[in-house]
A protein has these predicted regions:
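Long, internal scaffold/assembly segments composed of regular secondary structure
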Residues: 203-324
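Beta-strand-rich domains and repeat architectures in extracellular enzymes and scaffolds
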Residues: 26-63, 84-90
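Repeated scaffold domains used in trafficking and secretory/extracellular systems
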Residues: 30-40, 83-92, 127-141, 176-186, ...
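Short beta-strand elements that form the blades of beta-propeller/WD-repeat-like
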Residues: 39-40, 44-58, 94-105, 135-151, ...
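Conserved blade-ending motifs and adjacent loop-strand segments that build the rim/top face
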Residues: 218-230, 274-294, 299-310, 370-390, ...
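Bacterial Sec-dependent N-terminal signal peptides
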Residues: 1-25
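Beta-propeller blade signature
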Residues: 63-70, 111-117, 156-162, 202-213, ...
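Blade-loop segments of beta-propeller domains
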Residues: 71-110, 121-134, 175, 217-227, ...
Length: 482
């Protein structure tokens, strides 16, 4: 009995509140010479903060790169002249090097590469058409690979980082209009470009070499009835996989996830799982809404049909323990705001609202071994699809870290059954000075940095309770969970 009691106590101790300590803070005065700070963690190598000079001269202004240690101590500062109209577009970390993409409305771009090991900056200049998008940026073998849409034409772009030269592979299919072709995702694996391309109602896998020459094109969905909405290619161990979302209807959002091995450039043992068949998928909803969904499910089942919810999912790369495979997806939906100007109604996109995440374990045949869903609510709605959860293998178990409203969350899932064996949360304290309070915080963002460390940053109005002094700053605060 005593042994059983000790085991229960030990198990309960794993679900606890953790202490988050403010272990570093950087502040930039609101009226300083630089603005539009971009916070870019480089794993455990440090932190980069880039910003743009407010003043310009002869059409040029300075772009500053500051590099901080993990202790938030300034190590190096460097500035380069850029065209006045350039703005931050995207960033990628590859092999420990941070690549920042700056773009201008006329189509020109600059790629700024910062190496934390040498503190050196190199730049690549180039031009791209004004109306061309740059999606799914990947850095590999001295090149930037991306997908793009220009005048209803989709293409794969390859930029040489040494010369700035751009090469493009335009994607065409016989008897298919270019406007009905769209690159869902592209990545580089083993020096080969893999692109998943929507072609009308089908999805093709395209393979290209690093010069843009096409190596093959296979229709992945010729023999399946489901419509693939999103998909990504991963390599785990020595096997390739495709995961993403699907729908059984011709229109609307996704109604479930799929998992398949990629063998000989074709689906092998593809399996589909309705969101509502997953464990706790609706737990984030109110009791009233859950009950409503259950009634609709029962009604559909009596009619011999399957009820489904429409959702979008930001899928992560597949992880493996060497035997089985783990899928992580973050559920979100677009939010629109409606305003009236006179008699005219204007609808504008307000960002993506993230609600919860799904962690699932599959065997190589695509069979679902277990799944867990948990709520997550970031502090802001991003204007683009991104990942808020950081995932890694901790031994054989799966470790997830993320921010949920004003909390820092760490969850450890047991490999065998998906049960949470360690669940730690901590409230975010805004400053490390007990005499100061944050009265206002705008454009707040938070993300996992490395280990058990997080960053929270945004524009703040801080008040000192003793002196009554107020100051407006852009602040970056580091939290370490204990």
């Amino acid at each position: 009995m005593r042994t059983l009691l000790l085991c229960v106590i030990a198990l309960c101790s794993q679900v606890m509140s953790m202490t988050a300590q403010v272990t570093g803070r950087i502040e930039y005065p609101h009226r300083a010479d630089y603005e539009d700070q971009v916070v870019l963690p480089v794993d455990d190598k440090g932190l980069v903060i880039q910003s743009f000079a407010k003043d310009s001269k002869e059409g040029k202004r300075y772009f500053k790169t500051e590099f901080y240690s993990t202790a938030m101590k300034l190590i190096s500062t460097d500035s380069i002249l850029i065209d006045k109209g350039m703005y931050f577009y995207s960033d990628v970390v590859e092999s420990g090097v941070l690549y920042t993409v700056l773009r201008q409305k006329d189509g020109s771009f600059m790629i700024v590469a910062f190496n934390p090991a040498t503190h050196k900056i190199t730049t690549t200049d180039g031009e791209y058409t004004r109306k061309g998008s740059m999606r799914n940026l990947v850095i590999a073998n001295g090149s930037v690979v991306f997908s793009s849409t220009q005048k209803k034409l989709d293409r794969i772009g390859i930029i040489d980082l040494k010369t700035g030269n751009c090469r493009f592979t335009d994607i065409h299919f016989p008897k298919v209009k270019d406007k009905n072709i769209f690159v869902l995702e592209n990545t580089v694996i083993d020096n080969t470009i893999y692109a998943l391309v929507g072609v009308e109602t089908d999805v093709y896998l395209l393979r290209l070499d690093m010069q843009g020459n096409q190596l093959g094109a296979n229709n992945l969905t010729a023999d399946i009835a489901e419509r693939i909405i999103s998909a990504s290619v991963s390599k785990a161990g020595n096997k390739f996989f495709v995961t993403g979302t699907y729908s059984k209807s011709k229109k609307g959002g996704a109604e479930g996830i799929f998992f398949s091995e990629l063998k000989d450039d074709r689906f092998n043992n593809i399996k589909f799982y309705n969101f509502l068949k997953l464990k706790n998928f609706t737990e984030y909803m109110s009791d009233r809404k859950q009950a409503k969904i259950e009634r609709r499910k029962e009604k559909a089942e009596k009619a011999g049909k399957e009820y489904s919810l429409k959702y979008l999912m930001a899928s992560h790369r597949i992880m493996t323990d060497g035997k089985d495979y783990f899928y992580l997806g973050e559920a979100y939906y677009p939010v629109y705001r409606t305003t009236w100007i006179g008699n005219t109604m204007i609808t504008t996109f307000a960002g993506y609202n993230y609600t919860h995440a799904v962690l699932a374990k599959f065997d190589v045949a695509g069979n679902l071994l277990w799944d867990e869903c948990f709520p997550m609510e970031p502090r802001l709605m991003p204007m683009y699809v991104k990942h808020f959860v950081s995932a890694s293998m901790k031994g054989n178990n799966v470790n997830l870290l993320f921010t949920d409203k004003n909390r820092l969350v760490s969850k450890l899932f047991r490999n065998a059954d998906g049960n949470v064996i360690q669940d730690r949360t901590s409230e975010i304290i805004e400053t490390d000075n007990e005499d100061e309070d944050v009265k206002k915080m705008r454009y707040s963002n938070s993300q996992h940095w490395y280990g058990d460390n997080f960053l929270v940053y945004g524009t703040q109005v801080v008040k000192n309770s003793k002196t009554g002094e107020r100051r407006k700053v852009f602040a970056v605060t580091k939290y370490t969970i204990k």
